[in-house]
Amino acid sequence: MQSLWIYPEDTEVLGAACKSLLKALKPRYQKIALFSPISGGCEGFGECESLSSLEVHSAIDKQKALELVSTAQEELLFETILKRYDELQSTHDFVINLGYAPKFFLNALLDLNTILAKHLNAPVVAVAQTSLDHLKAMHSHILKKEAPFAIGLFVGETLEKPHFLSASLCKQQCELEASAIENLLQTKSEIITPLAFQRSLEKKAKKQIKKVVLPESEDERILKAAHRLNLMGAVGLILLGDKEAINSQAKNLNLNLENVEIINPNTSHYREEFAKSLYELRKSKGLSEQEAERLALDKTYFATMLVHLGYAHAMVSGVNHTTAETIRPALQIIKTKPGVSLVSSVFLMCLDTQVFVFGDCAIIPNPSPKELAEIATTSAQTAKQFNIAPKVALLSYATGNSAQGEMIDKINEALTIVQKLDPQLEIDGPLQFDASIDKGVAKKKMPNSQVAGQASVFIFPDLNAGNIAYKAVQRSAKAVAIGPILQGLNKPINDLSRGALVEDIVNTVLISAIQAQDY
């Protein structure tokens, strides 16, 4: 589904612009929607006769939007808009997003246009009657507003390229040149904001509902996350604990757990089955029947057994337990996938306009070349699960052949192993971080690399580097760090930080459900 965001910098020329746009769209698309995210702000669009046959859809009225902004609830405003936009996407082939003229809200209007367009991943098209120099200045302003995706100016040519191919649009013109419209429709925006990525997780999880068990129901963060997930309807949920106590706490917190299954390990009919199964699995390791019965009452082991025996599809734990306490039962019971020798982790780093994969940042302290290669291949597979095309950079303090040493040898060996295991995977190294992400630096340091300058998956040489890096990016760039996401297990078990926020828990549960779709 395609879309454009029209910014009416000059409302007097909207008629000509809209007429030309619809003339090009109607032969190509049967279902075209007009979307004004905040109603009452589309000044000038109402006078465009060519749009009169199309219904205008909105997400929220202006007064409510102002209330949310004035009370610092912008994220709720954008979530409301994204939800309505997703509904339109499912029923239409093309969405024309109607932007806001400079008088709307009487403040930072271009910011509103570019912020919303970023969340909707829609190229911005500015309709203007002005000089070429002014248009160039306007484009520069858009770029300074951190919206590099805002690449269209509806004046005969898009601004995807650094030069202009034609002059300004005169008010008297009845329509734009066909070539300008054609160029415009070829414009693509490939950005994703943290909010849009989180929405995509919800949509992906809903395609195939999976059941996730949360053993730490004594923590109100878990209950609040369960409430949000319950309203979302994207996953099935199991909470472990005393039903009466959980419902009482939920009532005190004004939470809705109506569709959430609650199991008490102490009284569950699964108790005997789990004890027997645990004993059979671990008796060769010296586990006695009495110890198996005791472990079956432990919430983490009980939750792991629910997943192992197929009563749940995934488990999320860790707000009140260490990583070792979460992973140990999984390693003992669920074990690793065939051909995989270790469990590693990645973080999905949601920056302003893109999502990167960082690994390993939580599990393996000092991976060998073989382990580093395995982390790289499993991280690439994880990236694919979340629609991130993997271009893998093996990171180091040096790029290419610019240095020698034990670390460089380790990365070169890991690269050779990966290339033998998966010849189709786009991977390169050693690469410094700037060479892996910046095309200008890459052109100088690794001009023949297919990965340098455009990496999406970043593999750190050890846990020290990985953990420091993800926290540095999270804090300094205000990125949303989703994870750690465990990879390599036979079934999804994921660990939470003990400082996890409700939003972190929601994201991890959605990711676990999505992982379970591949099992």
Swiss-Prot record:
Protein location: Cytoplasm
One Pfam family recorded for the sequence: PTA_PTB
Coiled coil: none
Gene3D superfamilies noted in UniProt: 3.40.50.10950, Isocitrate/Isopropylmalate dehydrogenase-like
Record-given protein name: Phosphate acetyltransferase
Biological process, per Gene Ontology: acetyl-CoA biosynthetic process
InterPro entries: P_AcTrfase, P_AcTrfase_dom1, P_AcTrfase_dom2, Phos_Acetyltrans/Butyryltrans, PTA_PTB
Involved pathway(s): Metabolic intermediate biosynthesis; acetyl-CoA biosynthesis; acetyl-CoA from acetate: step 2/2
An example Gene Ontology CC term for this record: cytoplasm
Catalysis: reaction(s): acetyl-CoA + phosphate = acetyl phosphate + CoA
Leading EC class: transferase
Enzyme Commission code: 2.3.1.8
GO MF term (any one): phosphate acetyltransferase activity
Region of interest called Phosphate acetyltransferase, as start-end residue ranges on this chain: 196-519
Record NCBIfam families: PRK05632.1, PRK09653.1, pta
Native organism: Helicobacter pylori (strain J99 / ATCC 700824)
Gene that encodes it: pta
